[in-house]
Regions:
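Bacterial carbohydrate/catabolite-sensing allosteric modules
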Residues: 1, 10, 42, 85-93, ...
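N-terminal helix-turn-helix DNA-binding module of bacterial transcription factors
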Residues: 1-60
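Residues at secondary-structure transition points
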Residues: 2, 27, 31, 49, ...
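Amphipathic helical "hinge" segments at domain boundaries
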Residues: 45-109, 200
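Short hydrophobic/charged patches on amphipathic alpha-helices used for structural packing
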Residues: 51, 111-112, 135, 170, ...
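Short hydrophobic segments within beta-strands
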Residues: 65, 100, 126, 183-184, ...
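Short beta-strand-centered segments that line the small-molecule binding cleft or hinge
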Residues: 108-164
Length: 246
Protein backbone atom coordinates (compact mmCIF):
# COMPACT_ATOMS: atom_id res chain seq x y z
CA UNK A 1 0.00 0.00 0.00
CA UNK A 2 1.45 3.41 -0.96
CA UNK A 3 2.51 5.80 1.79
CA UNK A 4 2.43 9.59 2.09
CA UNK A 5 6.06 9.61 0.96
CA UNK A 6 5.15 7.63 -2.16
CA UNK A 7 2.39 10.12 -2.96
CA UNK A 8 4.71 13.05 -2.36
CA UNK A 9 7.32 11.57 -4.71
CA UNK A 10 4.70 10.83 -7.39
CA UNK A 11 3.36 14.39 -7.27
CA UNK A 12 6.69 16.15 -6.80
CA UNK A 13 5.65 17.86 -3.57
CA UNK A 14 6.49 17.58 0.12
CA UNK A 15 4.86 15.13 2.53
CA UNK A 16 3.39 18.13 4.37
CA UNK A 17 1.69 19.31 1.16
CA UNK A 18 0.22 15.85 0.56
CA UNK A 19 -1.09 15.79 4.13
CA UNK A 20 -2.71 19.21 3.69
CA UNK A 21 -4.37 18.13 0.44
CA UNK A 22 -5.79 14.93 1.89
CA UNK A 23 -7.02 16.69 5.04
CA UNK A 24 -8.64 19.53 3.07
CA UNK A 25 -6.49 22.27 4.59
CA UNK A 26 -7.17 25.76 3.16
CA UNK A 27 -3.55 26.87 2.61
CA UNK A 28 -3.00 24.89 -0.59
CA UNK A 29 -3.95 25.64 -4.20
CA UNK A 30 -7.11 23.93 -5.42
CA UNK A 31 -5.35 22.54 -8.49
CA UNK A 32 -2.57 21.04 -6.35
CA UNK A 33 -5.11 19.56 -3.94
CA UNK A 34 -7.04 17.89 -6.75
CA UNK A 35 -3.85 16.61 -8.43
CA UNK A 36 -2.73 14.95 -5.18
CA UNK A 37 -6.15 13.47 -4.53
CA UNK A 38 -6.33 12.10 -8.06
CA UNK A 39 -2.94 10.46 -7.56
CA UNK A 40 -4.11 9.01 -4.24
CA UNK A 41 -7.13 7.44 -5.95
CA UNK A 42 -5.03 6.14 -8.82
CA UNK A 43 -2.42 4.61 -6.50
CA UNK A 44 -4.98 3.16 -4.10
CA UNK A 45 -3.79 5.19 -1.13
CA UNK A 46 -5.73 4.75 2.12
CA UNK A 47 -4.98 6.83 5.21
CA UNK A 48 -3.75 5.02 8.32
CA UNK A 49 -6.66 5.04 10.77
CA UNK A 50 -4.47 5.38 13.86
CA UNK A 51 -2.48 8.23 12.36
CA UNK A 52 -5.63 10.00 11.22
CA UNK A 53 -7.13 9.66 14.70
CA UNK A 54 -4.06 11.27 16.26
CA UNK A 55 -4.12 14.14 13.79
CA UNK A 56 -7.87 14.87 13.75
CA UNK A 57 -8.79 13.72 17.28
CA UNK A 58 -11.47 11.55 15.65
CA UNK A 59 -11.61 7.79 15.18
CA UNK A 60 -14.27 7.91 12.46
CA UNK A 61 -16.02 5.13 14.36
CA UNK A 62 -19.67 5.50 15.41
CA UNK A 63 -21.44 3.28 17.91
CA UNK A 64 -24.96 1.90 17.62
CA UNK A 65 -26.74 0.74 20.75
CA UNK A 66 -29.64 -1.41 19.57
CA UNK A 67 -31.20 -3.76 22.12
CA UNK A 68 -34.27 -5.60 20.83
CA UNK A 69 -35.97 -7.61 23.57
CA UNK A 70 -38.07 -9.43 20.97
CA UNK A 71 -34.86 -10.52 19.19
CA UNK A 72 -36.09 -9.51 15.77
CA UNK A 73 -32.60 -8.17 15.12
CA UNK A 74 -32.00 -6.20 11.96
CA UNK A 75 -35.25 -7.55 10.50
CA UNK A 76 -37.14 -5.16 12.82
CA UNK A 77 -39.67 -3.54 10.47
CA UNK A 78 -39.04 0.00 11.73
CA UNK A 79 -35.55 0.20 13.18
CA UNK A 80 -34.00 -1.85 10.38
CA UNK A 81 -34.90 0.97 7.97
CA UNK A 82 -33.59 3.60 10.41
CA UNK A 83 -30.29 1.77 10.90
CA UNK A 84 -29.88 1.09 7.19
CA UNK A 85 -30.25 4.81 6.41
CA UNK A 86 -27.79 5.61 9.20
CA UNK A 87 -25.30 3.10 7.78
CA UNK A 88 -25.52 4.61 4.30
CA UNK A 89 -25.00 8.16 5.56
CA UNK A 90 -22.14 7.12 7.86
CA UNK A 91 -20.30 5.27 5.08
CA UNK A 92 -20.65 8.22 2.72
CA UNK A 93 -18.88 10.36 5.32
CA UNK A 94 -16.10 7.85 5.90
CA UNK A 95 -17.28 6.42 9.23
CA UNK A 96 -17.23 2.82 10.43
CA UNK A 97 -19.97 1.43 12.68
CA UNK A 98 -19.59 -0.60 15.87
CA UNK A 99 -22.54 -2.24 17.63
CA UNK A 100 -22.32 -1.56 21.35
CA UNK A 101 -23.00 -4.46 23.71
CA UNK A 102 -22.12 -5.99 27.07
CA UNK A 103 -19.65 -8.66 26.04
CA UNK A 104 -16.30 -8.26 24.27
CA UNK A 105 -14.27 -11.44 23.79
CA UNK A 106 -15.85 -12.98 26.86
CA UNK A 107 -15.32 -9.91 29.01
CA UNK A 108 -18.36 -8.23 30.52
CA UNK A 109 -18.47 -4.44 30.40
CA UNK A 110 -20.99 -1.61 30.53
CA UNK A 111 -22.22 0.19 27.43
CA UNK A 112 -20.11 3.21 28.37
CA UNK A 113 -17.02 1.05 28.88
CA UNK A 114 -17.51 -0.48 25.43
CA UNK A 115 -17.80 2.99 23.91
CA UNK A 116 -14.54 4.04 25.54
CA UNK A 117 -12.91 0.73 24.59
CA UNK A 118 -13.76 1.32 20.92
CA UNK A 119 -13.09 5.07 21.15
CA UNK A 120 -16.28 5.91 19.29
CA UNK A 121 -16.87 9.49 18.19
CA UNK A 122 -20.54 9.20 19.13
CA UNK A 123 -23.43 6.77 19.64
CA UNK A 124 -26.91 6.35 18.20
CA UNK A 125 -29.26 4.78 20.75
CA UNK A 126 -32.35 3.00 19.42
CA UNK A 127 -34.84 0.42 20.63
CA UNK A 128 -33.63 0.10 24.21
CA UNK A 129 -35.02 0.44 27.70
CA UNK A 130 -34.15 4.10 28.18
CA UNK A 131 -34.59 3.69 31.94
CA UNK A 132 -31.85 1.07 32.12
CA UNK A 133 -29.16 2.48 34.47
CA UNK A 134 -26.44 1.63 31.95
CA UNK A 135 -28.26 3.54 29.20
CA UNK A 136 -28.73 6.51 31.55
CA UNK A 137 -25.02 6.33 32.41
CA UNK A 138 -24.09 6.46 28.72
CA UNK A 139 -26.48 9.32 27.97
CA UNK A 140 -25.08 11.36 30.87
CA UNK A 141 -21.45 10.67 29.92
CA UNK A 142 -18.99 12.65 27.80
CA UNK A 143 -19.81 10.54 24.72
CA UNK A 144 -21.92 12.42 22.12
CA UNK A 145 -25.30 10.70 21.86
CA UNK A 146 -28.34 10.86 19.58
CA UNK A 147 -31.46 8.99 20.71
CA UNK A 148 -34.21 7.62 18.49
CA UNK A 149 -37.83 8.17 19.59
CA UNK A 150 -36.95 9.19 23.13
CA UNK A 151 -36.05 12.57 24.59
CA UNK A 152 -33.41 13.24 27.21
CA UNK A 153 -33.34 16.92 28.16
CA UNK A 154 -29.68 17.51 27.33
CA UNK A 155 -29.30 15.26 24.29
CA UNK A 156 -30.18 15.39 20.62
CA UNK A 157 -33.07 13.17 19.50
CA UNK A 158 -34.73 12.08 16.28
CA UNK A 159 -38.45 11.60 16.80
CA UNK A 160 -41.34 10.05 14.93
CA UNK A 161 -44.65 11.90 15.11
CA UNK A 162 -46.48 9.10 16.88
CA UNK A 163 -49.44 11.29 17.83
CA UNK A 164 -50.13 12.29 14.22
CA UNK A 165 -49.50 8.74 13.03
CA UNK A 166 -52.15 7.19 15.27
CA UNK A 167 -54.59 9.98 14.53
CA UNK A 168 -54.20 9.31 10.81
CA UNK A 169 -54.67 5.58 11.37
CA UNK A 170 -57.87 6.04 13.39
CA UNK A 171 -59.27 8.48 10.85
CA UNK A 172 -58.52 6.05 8.03
CA UNK A 173 -60.43 3.32 9.89
CA UNK A 174 -63.30 5.76 10.43
CA UNK A 175 -63.30 6.67 6.72
CA UNK A 176 -63.67 2.95 5.95
CA UNK A 177 -66.87 2.88 8.00
CA UNK A 178 -65.60 1.64 11.36
CA UNK A 179 -67.06 3.17 14.51
CA UNK A 180 -66.07 0.56 17.09
CA UNK A 181 -62.28 0.84 16.99
CA UNK A 182 -60.02 -0.92 19.50
CA UNK A 183 -56.33 -0.35 20.16
CA UNK A 184 -53.83 -2.90 21.46
CA UNK A 185 -50.75 -0.87 22.39
CA UNK A 186 -47.22 -1.81 23.41
CA UNK A 187 -45.51 -1.65 26.77
CA UNK A 188 -45.16 1.66 28.58
CA UNK A 189 -42.70 3.92 26.76
CA UNK A 190 -42.80 7.51 25.57
CA UNK A 191 -43.64 6.18 22.09
CA UNK A 192 -46.61 4.22 23.46
CA UNK A 193 -47.84 7.18 25.50
CA UNK A 194 -47.82 9.38 22.40
CA UNK A 195 -49.65 6.76 20.36
CA UNK A 196 -52.33 6.38 23.03
CA UNK A 197 -52.70 10.17 23.12
CA UNK A 198 -53.09 10.24 19.33
CA UNK A 199 -55.68 7.47 19.48
CA UNK A 200 -57.86 9.28 22.01
CA UNK A 201 -57.44 12.65 20.30
CA UNK A 202 -58.65 11.24 16.99
CA UNK A 203 -61.59 9.50 18.64
CA UNK A 204 -62.60 12.73 20.37
CA UNK A 205 -62.35 14.72 17.13
CA UNK A 206 -64.52 12.12 15.37
CA UNK A 207 -67.05 11.98 18.20
CA UNK A 208 -66.33 8.32 18.92
CA UNK A 209 -66.96 6.97 22.40
CA UNK A 210 -64.42 4.25 23.10
CA UNK A 211 -65.19 1.76 25.90
CA UNK A 212 -62.36 1.32 28.37
CA UNK A 213 -62.05 -2.37 27.48
CA UNK A 214 -61.30 -1.45 23.85
CA UNK A 215 -57.83 -0.18 24.81
CA UNK A 216 -55.62 -3.12 25.77
CA UNK A 217 -52.12 -3.51 27.15
CA UNK A 218 -49.95 -5.50 24.75
CA UNK A 219 -46.26 -6.04 24.06
CA UNK A 220 -44.47 -4.96 20.89
CA UNK A 221 -43.62 -7.85 18.55
CA UNK A 222 -45.22 -10.44 20.86
CA UNK A 223 -47.58 -12.43 18.64
CA UNK A 224 -48.96 -14.60 21.44
CA UNK A 225 -49.78 -11.62 23.65
CA UNK A 226 -51.49 -9.84 20.75
CA UNK A 227 -53.49 -12.98 19.99
CA UNK A 228 -54.55 -13.20 23.64
CA UNK A 229 -55.73 -9.57 23.70
CA UNK A 230 -57.48 -10.03 20.34
CA UNK A 231 -59.43 -13.01 21.67
CA UNK A 232 -60.47 -10.94 24.68
CA UNK A 233 -61.74 -8.18 22.39
CA UNK A 234 -63.64 -10.60 20.17
CA UNK A 235 -65.28 -12.16 23.23
CA UNK A 236 -66.90 -8.86 24.25
CA UNK A 237 -70.71 -8.61 23.90
CA UNK A 238 -70.18 -5.69 21.51
CA UNK A 239 -66.90 -6.46 19.90
CA UNK A 240 -64.93 -3.96 17.80
CA UNK A 241 -65.06 -3.99 14.02
CA UNK A 242 -61.47 -2.73 13.74
CA UNK A 243 -58.41 -3.43 15.89
CA UNK A 244 -55.22 -1.38 15.73
CA UNK A 245 -52.21 -3.47 16.72
CA UNK A 246 -48.85 -2.35 18.18
Amino acid sequence: MPSLKDLAKECGVSVATVSKALNDQPDIAAATRERIRAAARRMGYLPNAAARALKTNRTYNLGVLFVDERQSGLTHEYFSAVLDSFKVEAEQRGYDITFINHNISGRSMTYLEHCHYRSVDGVVIACVNFYDPQVVELVNSDVPVVTIDHVFNNRMAVLSDNVAGLKALVKQAWACGHRRIAFIHGEKTSVTENRIAGFYQACEELGLEIPEEYVRDGVYHDVERCAEETRALLALPQRPTCIIFP
